[in-house]
């Protein structure tokens, strides 16, 4: 039986549902979403943890199924679902950057260079690149970003990581978030601007979105 991690769920985590979970989700789904849900269940692909709905219960987790862009219109559909924690078979962090390299197409060499320079940083990816790596379906286009997740534990690691991301952003369409302890996520580009020109930043958490000053977030990191 799945046991929820002590640290709780975090946005962009991956969640696999048991058969009963898919059955419950299908029972509440809109008709146009049912084929995608059936495909996800049949392939045993994970759903992605998203911010909790305001009326979600404590024993639920809110999830998303980002579908591939429409071949003709390019429209992106994200199927929003909820699952009971008891219907989860397993959960995992977002996709490791190294694991996504094989699915990165024209970015592969440049992403491999980022992965080498970011050794020890534990970079992960979400969004189009992650979904393409997980499913084998076509998500990445010439307009896609590379959404990275960076979980620093110390101020030095944060500074080093920001230097690496800023340098490689000249060669890659890098986007994504710094995730401070407790799942407090900030756009790494917004953080860079706020450090250069002091300002509050938007912090995204599992249950809320708020403004915070950079000092309060830095205080959650180790000094070394």
Model-derived features: positions:
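Helical scaffold of the NTase/Pol beta-like nucleotidyltransferase catalytic core
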Residues: 1-128, 161, 166-172, 176
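Conserved beta-strand segments of the P-loop GTPase G domain that flank and frequently precede/overlap
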Residues: 64, 151-152, 179
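Mature, function-bearing regions of proteins
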Residues: 78-86, 191, 196-219
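Active-site nucleotide-donor binding segment shared across nucleotidyl transfer reactions
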Residues: 112-146, 150-154
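Short, glycine/charged-enriched secondary-structure capping and boundary segments
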Residues: 138-141, 164, 191
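Short acidic, Gly/Pro-enriched loop/turn segments at secondary-structure junctions
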Residues: 155-159
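Conserved catalytic core of two-metal-ion nucleotidyltransferases
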Residues: 168-203
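Extended catalytic-interface subdomain
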Residues: 221-224
